[in-house]
Amino acid sequence: FRSLGAVYQNFKYLAMLLSIGKDSTILFWLARKAFFGHCPIPLVHIDTTYKIPAMIEYRDRVAKEWGLNLVVGKNQKALDEGMNHEKGRLVCCEALKTQGLQCIMEEHGYTGLILGIRRDEEGTRAKERYFSPRDKNFEWNFKDQPPELWDQYKTSFAEDTHIRIHPILHWTELNV
């Protein structure tokens, strides 16, 4: 996978996830380099309310100073119903992150998401592809993945899918 510029040209409704962690920050830096100091791709931050205030202040300050299109999503309903980490990591992440992202995608019509994940982070991510389809329920069939050989990628998918694009998938912790 070589070019964020090509991805930007080929996906009509594209956004980039920004968790404010090291990987998404590197990805944002790469996007700014690809677009000569500007990032034309909307940045989506899913606010779980668990980030330290200094991170949120940094996010807001950078977005304002650099004129970024920052979209902040939050599953307020789940938070109002008492969702928190004490209910279990998987349950909490599903409610606050996944459902929060689903709401933002529906609201803004995004069909492509750029993420800063790496294969070496976790077992399931080792099965990811640079262009990874999800169905309308955000389900991913990891058993039915097309090969990605010699920089040839499948980039067209069924109508009801959105595509997750992973530019730094091949990076390691040391690369970051």
What are these regions (language model features)?
Residues 1-176:
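Nucleotide-activated chemistry modules centered on ATP-dependent adenylation/adenylyltransferase
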